[in-house]
């Protein structure tokens, strides 16, 4: 699994970097399977992955935010977000990724996950019960220090006012616009928590956004719960959405819940 996920990420990065200067990444081609517009850069990245799956006859179904579910009559599914942080990419903000995960039916049974920062090439990877790495070096979450806390939070048109309450609970707060990489920063011990509370269900997190990074977080010692404090599990279904709190140290919950 490791080798094929790394190959996919490398091919996506090559394809994304080969787009000509001045190429309109924001061009909306059609409505994706998840109900959001598919931009040119999303399509280029997705096509590279789908081509690899078909050429190598990989033993996976595919779930992607652009094309939806491709039933190849396999027991496992490759869950992909070809470009997570599309708007960052389109606007020239250097913080976006490709997210790749392999599992059977839901977040709970994801076996392997890879998130690559397509700007820097930094690659986060995890396999179930084998730990998490950044560029092949082990990573782990950090102990919570309320006097040095940094929280990540979703802020935008559909965010709940509760997100602003959450942001004030940390010494610093940031909103970076790429869920998979933000979750990985938490796994790496750079921040203490990551929070999303959307007022509109359809704008909450999708499983394709976080299938890989949730495994990376858990293997680094962190956890993710829904806003009722239940361990988050999401089916491999583009229609299912959720809000969440992710954290590196259980002590965070004493401050924010």
Question: Where do the model's predicted regions map?
Answer:
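DPxDG-like acidic metal-binding loop motif
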Residues: 74-129, 147
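Buried hydrophobic packing segments
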Residues: 49, 53, 98, 102, ...
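Residue-level signal for inorganic ion chemistry
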Residues: 42, 53, 86, 117, ...
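Short His-Asn-centered micro-motif
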Residues: 64-66, 116, 154
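An extended, acidic
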Residues: 12, 129, 141-257
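Short Gly/Pro-enriched turn/cap motifs at secondary-structure boundaries
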Residues: 29-30, 37-41, 91, 174-176, ...
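N-terminal subdomain of lithium-sensitive/metallo-dependent phosphomonoesterases centered on the IMPase/IPPase/PAP
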Residues: 1-83
């Amino acid at each position: 699994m490791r080798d094929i996920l790394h190959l996919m990420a490398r091919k996506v990065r090559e394809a994304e970097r080969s787009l000509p200067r001045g190429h309109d990444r924001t061009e909306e081609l059609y409505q994706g399977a998840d109900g959001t517009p598919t931009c040119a850069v999303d399509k280029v990245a997705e096509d590279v992955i789908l081509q690899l799956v078909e050429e190598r006859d990989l033993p996976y179904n595919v779930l992607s935010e652009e094309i939806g579910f491709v039933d190849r009559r396999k027991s496992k599914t490759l869950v992909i977000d070809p470009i997570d942080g599309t708007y960052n990419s389109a606007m020239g903000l250097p913080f976006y990724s490709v997210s790749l995960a392999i599992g059977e039916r839901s977040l709970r049974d994801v076996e392997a996950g890879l998130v690559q920062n397509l700007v820097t090439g930094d690659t986060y990877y995890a396999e179930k019960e084998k730990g998490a790495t950044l560029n092949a070096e082990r990573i782990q979450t950090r102990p919570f220090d309320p006097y040095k806390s940094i929280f990540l939070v979703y802020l935008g048109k559909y965010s709940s006012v509760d997100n602003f309450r959450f942001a004030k609970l940390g010494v610093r707060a940031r909103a970076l616009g790429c869920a998979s990489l933000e979750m990985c920063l938490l796994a790496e011990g750079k921040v203490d928590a990551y929070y999303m509370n959307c007022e509109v269900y359809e704008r909450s997190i999708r499983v394709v956004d976080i299938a890989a990074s949730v495994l990376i977080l858990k293997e680094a010692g962190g956890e993710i719960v829904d806003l009722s404090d239940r361990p988050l599990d999401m089916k491999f279904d583009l229609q299912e959405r959720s809000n969440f709190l992710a954290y590196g140290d259980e002590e965070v919950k004493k401050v924010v819940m």
